[in-house]
């Protein structure tokens, strides 16, 4: 179900959920710069494949909220995605540095 999910988005989604388990879908969408519908789809898929689980909590007496918690499987996947994310960013950095150096050399 997540085969089409961008690896950077998948990583950022798991990282944000780990850092802010009580974040709302709306806030998650804003923080990651994607639509609310996309977040809803991704969260359902992450639950289906066992990367996260959903738990209820009462944030106040009149309101029911949810916690998104990474499972052991989700933590393993996040670790793998973190390595891939860092490798991609290092390559982007090296390419950008070469481009900057080339422009500076042409001045």
Named regions from a protein language model:
Residues 45-49:
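Alpha-helical DNA-recognition elements
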Residues 26, 37:
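Key DNA-contact positions within bacterial/archaeal DNA-binding proteins
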Residues 30:
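Alpha-helical residues within the helix-turn-helix
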Residues 2-9, 24, 55-79:
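Short, cationic-aromatic polyanion-contact patches
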Residues 8-21:
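Short amphipathic alpha-helical interface segments
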Residues 76-107:
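Amphipathic alpha-helical dimerization/coiled-coil segments
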């Amino acid at each position: 179900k997540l085969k089409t999910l961008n690896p950077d988005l998948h990583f950022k989604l798991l990282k944000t959920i780990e850092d802010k388990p009580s974040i709302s879908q709306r806030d998650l969408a804003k923080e990651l710069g994607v639509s609310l519908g996309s977040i809803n789809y991704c969260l359902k898929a992450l639950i289906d494949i066992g990367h996260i689980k959903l738990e209820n909590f009462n944030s106040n007496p009149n309101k029911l909220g949810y916690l998104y918690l990474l499972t052991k499987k989700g933590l393993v996947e996040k670790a793998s995605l973190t390595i891939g994310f860092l490798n991609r960013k290092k390559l982007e950095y090296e390419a950008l540095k070469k481009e900057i150096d080339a422009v500076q050399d042409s001045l």
